[in-house]
Amino acid sequence: MKKVYLIGFIMFMGIFLIFNGLQAGQDKEMPPAEAEGFWTYITETNSYEKWDFFPGYEGMYPGKSPHGAYLKLYANDTAIQAAKAGEQMPDGAILVKENYGKNKEDLMAITPMYKKKGYNPDGGDWFWAKYGPDGSVETSGKVDGCIQCHQVQDDFLFSKPK
């Protein structure tokens, strides 16, 4: 009888440890929709520079105004999975665009967009920001210029998986 209890206990602990291991691999707690906390999240807590490029936009590619002459587009796992499935971006999706000058070396700005459920339903629930290369906040929040330009696209996204 003790053997049955021991086997049951070992099985329970194994399932418990596997479940906790899976939980640890999930995205870190999502950031607030405010400039400073979001910057900390994408540069320290869950650095976007370790993320993959958005599908079809690997490496540097030509850009246009108001962004840089050349761009790099990073996306978190949530955004990449939705893009590959052909779905709209879900809550927690983050895209980070590095904006470069004509020489392809001078980083001019970092312009992320973050889907935060309930943040701005009229603006697709996107939080927008523009940071200087040093992380200084140039604009953030419900940015009219971003919303006006992007609203003509499905889910406010110009970048579609290729």
Predicted regions and their residues:
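Sequence-specific dsDNA recognition surfaces
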Residues: 67, 71-77
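Sequence context surrounding c-type heme c attachment/ligation sites in exported
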Residues: 25-50, 54-61, 67, 80-162
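Sec/Tat signal peptide C-region and signal peptidase I cleavage site
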Residues: 20-24
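Positively charged n-region of N-terminal signal peptides that target proteins for export
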Residues: 1-4
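Bacterial N-terminal signal peptides
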Residues: 8-18
